UniProtKB/Swiss-Prot annotation:
Gene induction: By vancomycin, mediated by VanS/VanR.
Domain of life: Bacteria
Record-linked NCBIfam families: vanW-B, vanW-gen
InterPro entries named among the record's database cross-references: Glycopeptide_resist_protein, Vancomycin_resist_VanW
Protein name: Vancomycin B-type resistance protein VanW
Amino acid sequence: MNRKRLTQRFPFLLPMRQAQRKICFYAGMRFDGCCYAQTIGEKTLPYLLFETDCALYNHNTGFDMIYQENKVFNLKLAAKTLNGLLIKPGETFSFWRLVRHADKDTPYKDGLTVANGKLTTMSGGGMCQMSNLLFWVFLHTPLTIIQRSGHVVKEFPEPNSDEIKGVDATISEGWIDLKVRNDTDCTYQIWVTLDDEKIIGQVFADKQPQALYKIANGSIQYVRESGGIYEYAKVERMQVALGTGEIIDCKLLYTNKCKICYPLPESVDIQEANQ
């Protein structure tokens, strides 16, 4: 039997534990030697590297749609802190360092989130859709991913987008961040906008790129193990030369593993762990 954490045994201690974690979380960033991106550019940089969009509303959660409306409200607050951000050479992007005070003037609403492996509602819930989008955008640039964690559980199918399997990025203030570092001599700029149906992510650069990046799944497997079904998705990145289309480089970035907690289509092949 797994031992319960102290905050699970005594839930009234949770707010104090969360406050403690956040203090240490942000203090750590003050003394980690990184130069964090914080400059907002008034003008858009000239070269568009990549653009993507994703449906805002997911109708497959099994929860009241009010939580989807609340999520969109939360995403709009967060987008205001990110739009136009410049990531200059040598700088590091931290999701939480930028979004930390997004609700300073207007409080977040309750949205869906996963806590202790279970889907629930929480103030500021739904923010992972923003971090997922940004991670997908960053993968299409030369920026170095230095901190990213995937969801260990998928409670419901993802909304329609051009993202492949295994490229999500969960975030939890005080615990889990999304960070990238600019090890190039170019400056990059991110924009996130929302219309009535979609959230749109863009990344621009101050110099003409010499190559583009394509992200694909090397393989996707579904395996029945430990009483559940797990998705194993290999994520590969190809660097393609502009003009010629020649593949300069292709490498496996990582293999993402997560538990699937919703019914898969009958056509999906599910292997047994001992095969």
